[in-house]
From Swiss-Prot:
GO molecular function: DNA binding
Chain's role: Self-assembles to form the virion icosahedral capsid with a T=1 symmetry. This very small capsid (17 - 22 nm in diameter) allows the virus to be very stable in the environment and resistant to some disinfectants, including detergents. Essential for the initial attachment to heparan sulfate moieties and chondroitin sulfate B of the host cell surface proteoglycans. After attachment, the virus is endocytosed and traffics to the nucleus. The capsid protein binds and transports the viral genome and Rep across the nuclear envelope.
Entry annotated with the keyword Kinase: no
Species of the source: Canary circovirus
The name this protein goes by in its record: Probable capsid protein
Length: 250
């Protein structure tokens, strides 16, 4: 007797349900740090923010029909942000680097009806920045065609973020005329030692390394000059805390 497929399927013994196997979860064990590496480590980075404020004067123009321009710039030096005063104290770190800078410029009680105009601001990360310091009576805006230039309104001011770069080609402000390239223990990381061995001077040599910088231009206002408040904020990183730097080195 031949059976159909459906009849054969009914007569087959049903399979027992498969038992589910419960696997024990693997809990990642906490990695234990050796006793000699606990606490402060050499790769720990400390981040600080420093603020500096000062006044900026835009000198007035000649008042004729010919439009004239002025330019100026800002260099970043860590020592300018540290209020040393008369106290002989030092930073308790070995190295530092400036990761970011922010420049804010706002007018002080100026009449918006007297003068209207706009200039440009641009980060310049080499020695060409100093070519624009304290320049007046220019026939054209020298920063208008720079790569990265942004327009700013004289009535409102501006805010600009940029990454400062330490000087590498010209001599440092150190008395020994040490180039800033000698301060860098790794050209990629740009960590700058805060002071040299047996450094007795305050401020320390490392904090005087110059960082470039932001240049800005403006049409010279008429009939009066314009006063601005400039606020510079830098974001620094320090590493290798060393409390022995707080005392005068021998």
């Amino acid at each position: 007797m031949w059976l159909t497929f459906n009849q054969v399927a009914r007569r087959r013994r049903p399979l027992a349900p498969r038992r589910r196997r419960w696997r024990r979860r693997y809990w990642x064990r906490r990695r234990r740090i050796p006793a000699n590496r606990r606490g402060h480590r050499t790769n720990r980075v400390y981040r600080f923010r420093f603020v500096r404020e000062f006044g900026q004067v835009l000198q007035k123009g000649t008042g004729g029909s010919q439009l004239s321009f002025g330019t100026d710039g800002i260099n970043i030096i860590l020592d300018d942000f540290l209020d040393w005063g008369t106290i002989n104290w030092r930073l308790p770190f070995e190295d530092y680097r400036i990761r970011l800078a922010k420049v804010e410029m706002r007018p002080l009680n100026e009449s918006w009806e007297e003068w209207k105009g706009f200039g440009h601001n641009v980060p310049i990360q080499d020695n060409h920045l100093e070519d624009f310091f304290k320049k007046t009576r220019l026939d054209a805006d020298p920063l208008a065609n720079w790569d990265g230039a942004r327009k700013w309104d004289l009535r409102k001011g501006f805010k600009r973020l940029f990454k400062p770069r330490p000087q590498l080609s010209v001599t440092d402000t150190d008395a020994a005329n040490v180039t800033a390239a000698l301060w860098l223990n790794n050209p990629k990381s740009l960590w700058i030692p805060i002071m040299k061995k047996s450094d007795q001077n305050l401020p320390s040599s490392g904090t005087r390394v110059k960082h470039y910088g932001l240049a800005f231009s403006w049409p010279e206002p008429t009939p009066n000059q314009m006063d601005y408040q400039v606020k510079v904020t830098i974001y620094c990183e320090f590493r290798q805390m060393n409390l022995t730097h707080l005392a005068t080195p021998k």
